[in-house]
Amino acid sequence: MDYHIEMLSGCPALYLPAVRRLIIMALLGLPLLSCTPAWQQPIAPENISFLSRSETQTHDDISVTVAVPSEEETQQLFGTNLYKSRVQPVWISVENRTQQGLTLMRNAVDDAYISPAEAAFLRHAGPRQADREMDLFFQAAEFKNPVPPGEIVNGYIFTNIDEGFKNINVDLLSDAALFNFVFTVMIPGLNTGMEYVDLDQLYTAIENVTATEDLQARLQDEACCTTNQKGTATGDPLNIVFIGERSAIMSAMIRRGWHVTEINHMKSALKTTRSFVFGRQYLYSPISPLYHYGRSQDLGLQKARQSVSRRNHIRLWLAPYRFRDMDVFLGQISRDIGVAFFKNTLTTHTIDPYVDHTRDGLVGDLAYSQNLSGVGYVAGSQVSTEVDTHYNLTPDPYYSDGYRAVFFFSEETTPLDEIDHIMWLPQWHPGLQPNVE
């Protein structure tokens, strides 16, 4: 089929007579031809609001502040859209009140960090003089080692892009010690369900449970399973409980490679289609709504594998009670292992039917987060066996011993060998029973 190329504002545009082909190519995300805009004059950081979202930690006479600009803010700060090249600048400031010089270890921030020259080169658009000015600007913007005693140094590390949340690990090395700071920061721009749920306004009053036995009773009395929107049919079992401050919970999840999920909209639908067709990762793909407390999940998280058809995902609901002033979330975890085709829904995910394997796998996963302080099990979920099998809404069969894994999170670092394995009686999990001679 004939086609012609037309120059439009210095950028080639390709026109095909067949509209259908254009739609297909747009759907699959195959850009016809691209043109990088010329570099524009950057705006000074103090004139952009991203530093208002900065977070600071202080210990051992060292203060570290980090901030991550959004896509729009990055465009303003650097005069070009680095996000289009999958580059995300992280601003770091170090105040050194010790008597020794400090070195920021760039690989701790991102083991595959991008050099300033590479970040600039990815956005070169000419003319040559503008490209050279861009190179020099990016070099000047980078964080410069060392941080001398009594001084403050700040600048950017160019990292690979994350959306929704970013885990930032800052290691500072002196002649005598290594100082570690870990942050989990929210990044504006990803269209997630979190933006539409105000957890602090869900309940007019909330009970604070203080006795362990009362907490156990509340968790055991919760519904066994999620439901459909009308509450007329049960779905996947509610098989996990998260207890802790929200910041500690999110830090643990992000550190272990979990990502918040986008809501369903046209852009996310196109991303999902590309992931399914080409077998690509889509770290933030939407998950379908399930219901508890009369509403869909307050928070969705997933850990993607090779493609959108293979992933672990979690749905969480904030409970109408707290435990010793800590949030309590009821949740559901399952593992998608493929896609099945149905007449009414066209396609749907197939879950690993042995849901306890996925539940217990989360224990091992989050143990490495260093935010998990304790784990136990409590009854209340749905028992499902080969003889008496239960199904989710798909309907997929699942098998379970009917226990919920209860995770306790802390802001304090907890090594693996210090995680408390809670032996809750009288119905402790069979896998945690002590050996009896």
Regions found by a protein language model. Give the residues of each.
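Low-complexity, acidic Ser/Thr/Pro/Gly-rich terminal tails and inter-domain linkers that flank the onset
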Residues: A44-Y83
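The feature marks short-to-medium sequence segments in extracytoplasmic or secretory-pathway proteins
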Residues: R97-P148, V153
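Terminal, regulation- and interaction-focused segments at domain boundaries
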Residues: E222-S251
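Surface-exposed edge beta-strand/loop patches
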Residues: A141-I206
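Short, hydrophobic/aromatic beta-strand segments
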Residues: Q100-A108, I168-V170, M250-R255
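Short, solvent-exposed beta-strand/turn "edge" segments of beta-rich domains on protein surfaces
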Residues: T74-W91, R97-G101, P146-P148, K230-G231
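C-terminal motif of bacterial Sec signal peptides marking the signal peptidase cleavage site
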Residues: L33-S34
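A cross-kingdom signal targeting lumenal/periplasmic-facing segments of multi-pass membrane
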Residues: Q88, E95, M266-N435
